[in-house]
A protein has these predicted regions:
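N-terminal Rossmann-like FAD-binding beta1-loop-alpha1 element of flavoenzymes
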Residues: 22-52
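Extreme N-terminal leader/targeting segments of oxidoreductases
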Residues: 1-27, 45
């Protein structure tokens, strides 16, 4: 039995050609998932000449199989980052994540994408005593870098639970509707897009 992400239901995939000839551009963006198409969009909006390449078809990779959450919370991460890179660098990382979250929501608003964007809390929880201690360390790491998180006493659904931390002002959305919306804007901006085009190497050559 094959399983398909719910995001792909009722969405008609794009059909872009593969790249078969040489071309010249200022920037090549490799990969047409959320990161790639958003990067191409932001560059094109700044007037940069961009080409977007995808080795498969758009939406078939990580983006098509995502959990669809927009959050700066990525598992038990910040305590580890502080241990390895210090408070200041971890703060910078968290700041970049917050800016990315804001940027995506701003794009959705500016382009009027109906991609079911919804503000929500992000919850990290466990039903294991040892992991509950790790959650306490993660919460302490949050507070060291100015992230406003808190312990929650219960979950909004009935599953085994010992401890959890929550972040407010996070979000969720339909990732492929967002992706398709950005791609349509890129088409309007005349950005060349190629599917089934594998980038195999990057060669540094002297500039003429």
């Amino acid at each position: 039995m094959k399983y398909f992400p719910i995001w792909t239901e009722k969405l008609v995939p794009f059909q872009f050609p593969s790249l078969k000839e040489d071309l010249r551009t200022e920037v090549v963006v490799i990969g047409a998932g959320i990161t790639g198409v958003t990067t191409a969009y932001l560059l094109a909006k700044k007037g940069v000449q961009v080409v977007l390449l995808e080795k498969d078809t758009i939406g078939r990779g990580t983006t098509g199989h995502t959990t669809a959450k927009l959050t700066i919370q990525h598992g038990l991460l910040y305590h580890e980052l502080i241990q390895h890179f210090g408070v200041e660098n971890t703060y910078r990382y968290a700041k970049s994540q917050t800016e990315g979250l804001t940027e995506i929501q701003q794009i959705i608003k500016e382009e009027s994408f109906d991609c079911f964007l919804q503000q929500d809390d992000a919850i990290l929880y466990t039903n294991d005593t040892e992991n509950a201690k790790k959650l306490e360390m993660e919460l302490d790491a949050y507070h060291q870098i100015g992230i406003d998180a808190k312990i929650i006493e219960s979950l909004p659904f009935d599953i085994p639970y010992i401890s959890g931390i929550t972040l407010s002002q996070q979000a969720q959305f339909h990732p492929l509707i967002y992706l398709q919306g950005i791609v349509k804007v890129l088409q309007q901006m005349k950005v060349p897009i190629y599917e089934n085009t594998l980038a195999v190497d990057v060669v540094n050559e002297p500039q003429l």
